[in-house]
Regions:
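Membrane-proximal helix-turn-helix segments that form the acceptor-binding/catalytic region
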Residues: 90-108
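Carbohydrate-associated surface elements
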Residues: 114, 136
Length: 314
């Protein structure tokens, strides 16, 4: 099969960027002719001889909808389908254009069962045109047994949505009980957002306990940590959870992502931190259960099988 995959930019190396690259590589390794192209290559490559085109986001479908004569388009959602429309009043013209463009897609891929009904309400698409397919971890097959250290790992870009400030507040509430523990935050953000997070850390005099590590490959940090804390407000799937599961590490997160993160109480998060920090057997049981579940439901081979089935049907 000849497959075009359009992603406007890979500049940020976010979870969605990684998932798209993984998909392109995986399908290529299964003998499909895959062309992955970005905004700079759009004019030259959009009219290639494809059997199907995968649109990887709402920016992408806006571009593709302007081109006539394209093959069937499969639209991806890397987040809750509501999320791109969160600024309805501020961006009403753009949002209206996105909805019109989405209706030109032949099929849709979402990350969770809960997203099906949301997408149906947004654009009136039938359930039969929506398929749930998750993501697999780039670390699959690379895990090794390591003795855990008293480190809480928090990966993700530093910004309000990733909500690292909630973790800082919660850890500050329990750190006196666990003097040997540290929080390692991996990720980068805008200078203003990084400065605000550092200021909050300094307000608790915890710079020696809460360490900003910047952006690095996370394989070794996952191996070393005791567990992962992921206080993000908005996620479609949360690749961090699947990544952590590869290493049998549990993930502490907010129960639901859209909206709940806005009102999450640091005291509740602190209670959960305390539970995990104080009980190594509990951590390991959760981590192993997560590994078993994710390996059964989000393996590379299973997800590629699901993608091949979807692409062959449109």
């Amino acid at each position: 099969m000849k497959i075009g995959i359009y992603k406007d930019t890979f500049a940020n190396n976010r979870g969605a960027d990684i998932a798209v690259k993984n998909l392109a590589t995986g399908l290529s390794e299964r003998a499909h002719a895959v062309t992955l192209f970005d905004k700079s290559e759009f004019a030259a490559k959009v009219r290639g001889e494809y059997d199907v085109i995968v649109s990887t986001g709402t920016n992408e479908i806006l571009d593709l909808a302007k081109v006539d004569g394209l093959p069937p388009i499969v639209q991806q959602f890397h987040t809750d389908p509501n999320y791109p429309f969160r600024h309805w009043i501020k961006r009403w013209r753009r949002n209206r254009a996105i909805k019109a463009a989405l209706k030109k897609a032949a099929a849709f891929q979402v990350l969770r069962e809960a997203h099906i009904e949301i997408l149906q309400k947004l654009i009136g698409v039938s359930k039969e045109r929506i398929t749930v397919i998750g993501n697999w971890s780039s670390f699959e097959g690379r895990a090794k047994i390591r003795t855990e250290e008293k480190i809480i790992l928090c990966p993700g870009a530093i910004n309000a949505d990733k909500n690292q400030s909630l973790l800082v507040d919660a850890f500050a509430a329990v750190t006196a009980e666990f003097p040997d523990w540290q929080v390692h935050i991996y990720g980068k953000g805008k200078a203003k957002e990084e400065a605000a997070l550092k200021k909050k850390i300094d307000s608790y005099a915890l710079r020696d306990k809460i360490v900003l590590k910047g952006y690095v490959d996370l394989e070794e940090p996952y191996r070393r940590c005791a567990f992962v804390a992921f206080p993000s407000k908005t996620e479609g799937f949360g690749m961090v959870i699947v990544d952590a599961a590869v290493f049998s590490k549990p993930t502490l997160m907010i129960h639901d992502w859209i909206g709940c993160g806005e009102v999450a109480d640091p005291r509740d998060f602190a209670l959960a931190l305390r539970r995990l920090m104080s009980d190594v057997d509990f951590r390991r049981d959760l981590g192993e259960s997560s590994r078993i579940y994710c390996s059964a439901n989000y393996s590379r081979e299973k997800i590629l099988d699901e993608w091949e089935a979807l692409l062959s049907e449109v």
